[in-house]
Amino acid sequence: MLKRKQSSRVEAQPVTDFGPDESLSDNADILWINKPWVHSLLRICAIISVISVCMNTPMTFEHYPPLQYVTFTLDTLLMFLYTAEMIAKMHIRGIVKGDSSYVKDRWCVFDGFMVFCLWVSLVLQVFEIADIVDQMSPWGMLRIPRPLIMIRAFRIYFRFELPRTRITNILKRSGEQIWSVSIFLLFFLLLYGILGVQMFGTFTYHCVVNDTKPGNVTWNSLAIPDTHCSPELEEGYQCPPGFKCMDLEDLGLSRQELGYSGFNEIGTSIFTVYEAASQEGWVFLMYRAIDSFPRWRSYFYFITLIFFLAWLVKNVFIAVIIETFAEIRVQFQQMWGSRSSTTSTATTQMFHEDAAGGWQLVAVDVNKPQGRAPACLQKMMRSSVFHMFILSMVTVDVIVAASNYYKGENFRRQYDEFYLAEVAFTVLFDLEALLKIWCLGFTGYISSSLHKFELLLVIGTTLHVYPDLYHSQFTYFQVLRVVRLIKISPALEDFVYKIFGPGKKLGSLVVFTASLLIVMSAISLQMFCFVEELDRFTTFPRAFMSMFQILTQEGWVDVMDQTLNAVGHMWAPVVAIYFILYHLFATLILLSLFVAVILDNLELDEDLKKLKQLKQSEANADTKEKLPLRLRIFEKFPNRPQMVKISKLPSDFTVPKIRESFMKQFIDRQQQDTCCLLRSLPTTSSSSCDHSKRSAIEDNKYIDQKLRKSVFSIRARNLLEKETAVTKILRACTRQRMLSGSFEGQPAKERSILSVQHHIRQERRSLRHGSNSQRISRGKSLETLTQDHSNTVRYRNAQREDSEIKMIQEKKEQAEMKRKVQEEELRENHPYFDKPLFIVGREHRFRNFCRVVVRARFNASKTDPVTGAVKNTKYHQLYDLLGLVTYLDWVMIIVTICSCISMMFESPFRRVMHAPTLQIAEYVFVIFMSIELNLKIMADGLFFTPTAVIRDFGGVMDIFIYLVSLIFLCWMPQNVPAESGAQLLMVLRCLRPLRIFKLVPQMRKVVRELFSGFKEIFLVSILLLTLMLVFASFGVQLFAGKLAKCNDPNIIRREDCNGIFRINVSVSKNLNLKLRPGEKKPGFWVPRVWANPRNFNFDNVGNAMLALFEVLSLKGWVEVRDVIIHRVGPIHGIYIHVFVFLGCMIGLTLFVGVVIANFNENKGTALLTVDQRRWEDLKSRLKIAQPLHLPPRPDNDGFRAKMYDITQHPFFKRTIALLVLAQSVLLSVKWDVEDPVTVPLATMSVVFTFIFVLEVTMKIIAMSPAGFWQSRRNRYDLLVTSLGVVWVVLHFALLNAYTYMMGACVIVFRFFSICGKHVTLKMLLLTVVVSMYKSFFIIVGMFLLLLCYAFAGVVLFGTVKYGENINRHANFSSAGKAITVLFRIVTGEDWNKIMHDCMVQPPFCTPDEFTYWATDCGNYAGALMYFCSFYVIIAYIMLNLLVAIIVENFSLFYSTEEDQLLSYNDLRHFQIIWNMVDDKREGVIPTFRVKFLLRLLRGRLEVDLDKDKLLFKHMCYEMERLHNGGDVTFHDVLSMLSYRSVDIRKSLQLEELLAREQLEYTIEEEVAKQTIRMWLKKCLKRIRAKQQQSCSIIHSLRESQQQELSRFLNPPSIETTQPSEDTNANSQDNSMQPETSSQQQLLSPTLSDRGGSRQDAADAGKPQRKFGQWRLPSAPKPISHSVSSVNLRFGGRTTMKSVVCKMNPMTDAASCGSEVKKWWTRQLTVESDESGDDLLDI
């Protein structure tokens, strides 16, 4: 998938300039600068410089004063070194003069700038040491550029052997694509920013105590927690008694104190929208909006914002990065290297018997030096028993380490049983390593990378068992033993190797990420280290943690908000832009790079893809052969076929045993034969056939089959001979024409892609048919012998591929036949086979009735009685939807939906058991499902029938859901205790929405796509679990019992942790109020408790795994980090950072990569080669292309024509786009009736509205109303402008809040039209729209899963008490609220905290033994399973499917002019030509006009009639054949051109290739026949002319008799088809046409030539002349010069019968040619707008 965009050009150019580090010149004066050690020293100095600048902060010097002098010394040294290097380079290169002077080299300028920054930093530090400049002054910001010197350290690794032009092109294209998507993102940010301003405005109304006075707002004035409210009584939240709703801005709070997030004006609004789109803190914004404004506004705004911005638009960003960097990665393949094999080149492989008795390939190094161990030990060491013993010991060691737990404070930790076990295992693995070294020798042992890893573990674990180092950082070596277990599973080992590929690729990305983090941390450090009240950037470790936190997105908004508050109001916008740009780059581009690399590693090599396609086809054929196991079970029973029973014969006669099926076949055959025999007799045929069981049509079919069998062998021989002969004649003609040099006089011209592909096909077929004569092209000598040989080999390979394809096709047919035969045999030999429930007969009336009911479906597709083609009706999409499933399934879908709606009204306080109204839907569902299942079982059987109800997982699920519903309905328990069987039954009942998955075929497909790739997802899960286990074991050994602390921060020791203390309460996260003198924050007294953190601990492996699973989702890891640093030590912060980096960068991107790869594999795109993938993209792109909805320019040069020119001018379009943007800017502040600024803004909007009215009027005048209405965009503009006019009238009449709201709505609707005016925006919007359309069923599937979990959540957690995150907004008290909470969890917003709130257990809650709705306790095990499974399924798998679909659809629009297939320019050119031909804008043209269309095409689609006559004939005949001379659509012609423009051998897949080749062979044969027929007619003409010349004397003698006979005789005509009476009647008209050359007759239909016209509908049943069958005209008659004006009109569809051409053919052709030329020029000037805005009309 990712390699399909690589450029096909190979440039042989010198490698790129490496920058200033290469050798400057051989005769340089200063030689030391060229030494390699100097380059290495300078690179090390660059790293030292970064370290120095990271230490250079006031806080660091305060903690470690000597560092001030250390940094000064280092900087002085570096300054001298780099200055010397700069002077030396200037001396060698020259400063300004010369091509390679110092100033002209970019790298040299960069190095010089770094030296300048170093000087500035040093001078500044001198002033700081001398106390002339304060260390906390902003002058320190001058050091900001210094960390960029890190680039010098890694510049050496950017040496790539690629031509400079190639790199420039790649970077240019990448930049263009990223810029385009940035514009797209900006469009949506602007849209939602405007909507936010107008829908919400400010969030400044809060609940405050009644006695609050202006200027005296403190923490104690606010509600706890701080609550937003609405001043309007009907909407939002109303404050409780004792509080009033007040605007805090009116009470004197500044903007800085109120916080920066909100929708006050457009700038703040865009900032807030970006924060929400990062899915961090968006839900709290929504809750504020719900409290302040009407509820529906908040839900609509924020849910659509998350869906479009966070999921769709941002994923388009990921798609762009994957696509643009795909080409870079392909070019850098030389630098990264390809995946080599697992064994080294020095090793060979041999078969070895494994433990299970099978054989496996084992690498054996023949050159490996043998150790000194005895042979028996060497044999033992190589045995599989020894290997499995060691792995089993590793497993036991891992289990023992995982069993460790915290045993209490008083337990002696040094020498417990776990320590002794660790010592024993360490000794065992030390002995294993010594044995291997003894057997292999140290050199042989160390040569394997696996042995190096084992030796590292042995040394580390040996040091670890030393008592002082036990429970230290050396524990890593112990827990890393688990990695050795990957060797147990070969599948897992291969998968790991495939994903991580060559270490260079992923390793270079990790190094790049780490370097970026260090550089950005150092920059931020120097930017903010002097800011007071900001402790996040005081030292380098703190700065690094903050920037890393932004990279992972967890709490990044808090980092930004704290910094904004600290820097003050003036610098806040600059700081916000800095953090947003860093966040954008880190989260989108950097993470996308990891996904792209993993996808590239999962990509198959090109040469393997076609092989895999063939193998897959073979495998499919093999699987189709076998019947399912449930049917094969009948083969175990003895055969008991049904015998003939004759009831009326006496017992004296013995009836032979004859199978009933044989007797039936015999009787049927006899009746058929008798009927057919009697039919041939003259008299009795009708009477005898009346008594026959078969109809006349069936008899005809039977005779037809008999005849076909009889002539089959003769026909097969004749067909082959005929095809070979015709092809040989055609190829010989082509070669003769090429050799005769018929094209000598014409200038050389670049051939079109159609011509190139046509000649490729000709060459291929000529070789395939065994034509061995030499092919000599014009102007070239004979081919050399080697080239001939390579051609022969190539075409032999093609022949072999052909035979493979045919073999697979035959195999498929045989498998299908075999399967049918097996089924028929079982049906015949086993009387109970295919009998539902072993009771209902196979052909029983009741079963047939059930079948009719079950399989009845809506079918509105009408077929043409003549052609058999399906006609598209007006509402065919609606009809297709109705025909999607059967009527019975539609009924069940409706019943299931109604039942789910009824379940939505259930809650713990309104239960189905006690609410009769809710039971109605329950009864209806069970009754309808009973009827449905009974009908289906009677029609198709339950289990042991071919089409049984239970034949897959869906059937099992149906029966399960039915049984659960039935049991619940019968039982209907009145009291349901918590955690009981009845509650479990209620939870299982919540699976009811999953029925829709089974009923809708597309939903089943989604599930299939999900589960067919389950193996890879399972392997990724194992890898992540292994990673978690390693870190969990380490965490238990280091942090068990150490995280517990007293809740009073002033108490350090456990024995002092008693009594009570006052704890402060957190009031608000958003407000930044400062405490007044003497004021205390609100708080209350609580007892002191020594306890673990609330949400996590590392006291045992289970709890540690849960904590790390939450961290893996990047939620809550900041709290874990802070607790570990605060309670164990700062050095242990490395632990959680390493885990998050591995989990976030590699673990989660692995999930994304694997889900995308599986999606492609299931869709069949993973195995597609580059060419096949491009072809699929092209087909999808052409599907959504439409004809230009642009009417033609008016004929004359009058007023309308001038208007047309003005409205179509690019300047006019850009002006209108700017006016739309200008009007949208008017919505930068909220339009409020009470605000005085609203009136002038509305007045300006009125002016803009009148301008747009003028624009629409001009367009209507220019295009005419009918022409204007053709374009959907014009219709949309007209609608918006009409609404604008209505608004202007209402605004001046009423002038109230509603008119202002309507005005804002009109402007927002107008803002949408920007997308249509910008090509890139339109393309990307189409990507999103097409992705939404294609992912519709995935989104529906997500919603159904959400619904199931919501219903279950109401049952399990409906009454849980409020906690940290379960509150009045987020709870499970009803299905609606549960859906909102689950949608929040999908975005990952604090899902782990909600889970812990739902785990609450006594004594922190009130239990109840009898009913679950009377308790406010949670369910620990239920919450664990519920939330973890939901988060994994939705967030890790389903959302990544959305990414996969968007990545796939984006490739449709990632088209460049370098692409070999049809580009946008080609498509645009075709649209313009189509508009010329389809002058009525109907989207269809008659078949005869296709010739005219093809002749007008230019550029890459041009068909040169002089060189490619045959191709032209093929294309015209293809259109006639496929559409039977009827109308052809825009897409029909485009599809034909696309097939002709590609090499079908490379681009088409198996089935499509076979069908296409068959069609092309047929067309070729038919055209050949027509060509021969026309040639024969010409020969006959010549013969007749000669005969007439030789018989001129006789002719003159009989002239008088001839004149009298001419009125009775028709002129002779040579026809292959029998002419109808109507044709004979019109023969006079036909004979009046003048005789023209054969080329004009076949290939050059002029505008007046009616030869290609369609016949009328009345002639549909009559035999038509095929393409190329031209009647010989009789002797020419005098031609009158009168001509109908209709004939000169291009769009006229007059048939041959209605209009007769009566003018000179040469004059006619010339006049029409000049008219077309004028028309072509006019259309080209008007319609070739450089903006390409109508390329794809939405």
Swiss-Prot record:
Extracellular side: 58-65, 130-137, 200-269, 290-294, 404-416, 469-472, 531-543, 564-569, 907-915, 973-980, 1040-1104, 1125-1129, 1228-1236, 1294-1296, 1358-1378, 1399-1420
Residues carrying sugar: 210, 216, 1064
Phenotype when changing residue 1115 to A: No effect on the blockage of NALCN pore by Ca(2+)
Effect of residue 578 to S: In CLIFAHDD and IHPRF1; nearly eliminates wild-type protein expression; dominant-negative mutation; decreases membrane expression; induces higher current density and slower inactivation
Keyword Aminoacyl-tRNA synthetase: no
Sequence ranges on the Cytoplasmic membrane side: 1-36, 91-106, 159-173, 323-382, 440-447, 493-502, 600-886, 940-947, 1004-1015, 1160-1210, 1261-1271, 1319-1331, 1448-1738
InterPro entries per UniProt: Ion_trans_dom, NALCN, Volt_channel_dom_sf
PTM: Phosphorylated on tyrosine residues.
A GO CC annotation given for this chain: monoatomic ion channel complex
UniProt membrane topology term: Multi-pass membrane protein
Effect of residue 481 to Q: Exhibits altered current kinetics
Compartments where found: Cell membrane
Intramembrane residue ranges: 270-289, 544-563, 1105-1124, 1379-1398
GO molecular function: leak channel activity; monoatomic cation channel activity; sodium channel activity; voltage-gated sodium channel activity
Polar residues: bias regions: 1613-1632
Gene Ontology terms describing biological process: calcium ion transmembrane transport; monoatomic ion transmembrane transport; positive regulation of synaptic transmission, cholinergic; positive regulation of synaptic transmission, GABAergic; potassium ion transmembrane transport; regulation of resting membrane potential; sodium ion transmembrane transport
Membrane-spanning residues: 37-57, 66-90, 107-129, 138-158, 174-199, 295-322, 383-403, 417-439, 448-468, 473-492, 503-530, 570-599, 887-906, 916-939, 948-972, 981-1003, 1016-1039, 1130-1159, 1211-1227, 1237-1260, 1272-1293, 1297-1318, 1332-1357, 1421-1447
Effect of residue 561 to A: No effect on the blockage of NALCN pore by Ca(2+)
Stated regulation of activity: Inhibited by low micromolar concentrations of Gd(3+) and high micromolar concentrations of verapamil. Insensitive to tetrodotoxin (TTX) and potentiated by low external Ca(2+) concentration.
Family listed: Belongs to the NALCN family.
Protein name in UniProt: Sodium leak channel NALCN
Organism: Homo sapiens
Gene behind the chain: NALCN
